[in-house]
Amino acid sequence: MNAVGALENHDLGALRAQSLLTTQEWSVADLDATRALARALADLDRRGIRTPLCPDELAWAVFFDQSTRTKSAWAGASSRLGMRPVIVDGSSTQVSHGETAVETGAMLGMNAHARGIRHDLILGEGNTFIRDVQQGIDDYLVATGDPRQVPIVNLQCDVDHPTQSIADLLWMEDNLGDLAGKKIAVSWAYSPSYAKPLSVPQGLITLLTRFGADVTLAHPEGYRLTEETMSAAESNAAGGGSFRVVDDMDEAFRDADVVY
């Protein structure tokens, strides 16, 4: 069965208007449907078949940190869907002058059909900010009787980088097949921006453990990830994979199928 035909096996309607704030909040069925849809859209794009599923809708993204790949991906994906991408620097918004996230959400909810936010520089703030923006949008739509639904996509925060983690999962499956029993080493070390890199390994250990992988997290002694994320990875691994933590890179990489 080709990628487009495989969509028959998934409930795509369940994805409609869903915000993606962390992969941990999505069911395995919805994650499966998302990857199937991504494969189908990529296949159609390679064959030159247009997919303007959201014609002339506004896809608004704001970045409070630097980005190359995610900005390009947001613009490319939304354009392929027929949307009009708008990408702004967070420092140019009124947030820099004291406007709250809820107020910003209400303002942007007046026009947007989809929102993307990157807010990853301060540990303990980014994901909360994104949720507050979502609340502002939802409150505005209810107060005005606007029938639109405006989902938010987390384009990297202090907790997770869900779009990158899902893309990494796709690549691994396309190259290795089923990840059950595959050994994956996830490493990370010091960065001048301490909070920023947390979201990448955290996103990987919480997502890959849900798909049966044997995940080893390697980092220098003392550089633990957040307790909530570590607990989630351990809980997810109980469903069929495994999760362990080491501070020795050689041990982590031994017999690994993937080194990240």
Positions of PLM-derived features:
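Positively charged, low-complexity intrinsically disordered leader regions
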Residues: M1-G76
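Residue-level preference for short coil/turn positions at secondary-structure junctions
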Residues: R16, C54-P55, R148, A180, ...
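Residue-level detector of flexible, active-site-proximal loop/helix-junction positions
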Residues: S27, S92, V159, G222, ...
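General structural feature for long, well-ordered alpha-helical segments within catalytic domains
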Residues: D30-L37, T70, T104, E125, ...
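Generic structural signal for well-ordered alpha-helical scaffold segments
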Residues: R39-R46, L169-D174, I205
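Alpha-helix termini
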Residues: L44-G48, G136-P147, N175-D178, S235-G240
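Phosphate/diphosphate ligand-binding glycine-rich loop within oxidoreductases
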Residues: P52-E173
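Glycine-rich phosphate/diphosphate-binding loop of Rossmann-like nucleotide-binding domains
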Residues: F64-S79, E173-Y260
